[in-house]
Amino acid sequence: ATINGFPFNSQIELLKTHIKKMAELKPDAFIVAAPGVVRLCREIAPQIDIHLSTQANVLNYLDAQVFWDMGVKRIVVAREISLKDVMEIKKHLPDMEIEIFVHGSMCFAYSGRCLISAVQMGRVPNRGSCANDCRFEYTLYAGNDEHGSLFRLEEEPGVGTYIFNSKDMNLASHIQEILDSGAVDSLKIEGRTKSPYYAAVTAKAYREAIDDYYAGKFEPEKYQKELHTTKNRGFTDAYLIHKPFEKTDSQNHDYALSKGSYEVTGLV
């Protein structure tokens, strides 16, 4: 059950009621981001496990330790983390379950730490209503304060740029490294706003990758061929192997519309 928003003071009492109602449904866990909400869940429904959301942006073992001490059983680490850092967290907290994102959209900021959507559209990312303003086409201007002139910067005549647009994460080719690390307990695939076709294909591809790894016949090309049939904005392995700022291929400045080699034509 997801409760990973960041509530205002005026919503605390409603949140308490919400947690009680959710607990009655006996979910496997609450996915929470805010430290105060973690504590509230522990007080109201101590029988429900707490999984820390990727929105909490955990990148190191110090932050992980804080949440472990609060009673968090599993951390979905930040999308921006490297496998080396995941292994370091596991080394310091061997009993903490670690879940990583392996596939799906990426934020151009640390996950959800962006107010562009809130400022332009009144829709706040960390409150579950991001309008994906980073996917819009923007036009750049250069100004001259002395003369008061403004010049439009163009890569092509009349064409703007998708300067904030991130590619999609795709770590299927790195499943062997991830599982070899012994530090990861669960793999997470983004499903929000995705089609049933997308969910089915991605889940199938990663299930095959995991099973093939344990069977000793890991074939990255096979999984990638299947994954490229889904809608995507171009793929990147993000920061799993490379730390932030060491990679330059995580942005797609050419287009924001998701493209795939297959189109769904009907449901059977």
Model segments located where?
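N-terminal active-site wall of soluble small-molecule enzyme domains
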Residues: 6-25, 29-66
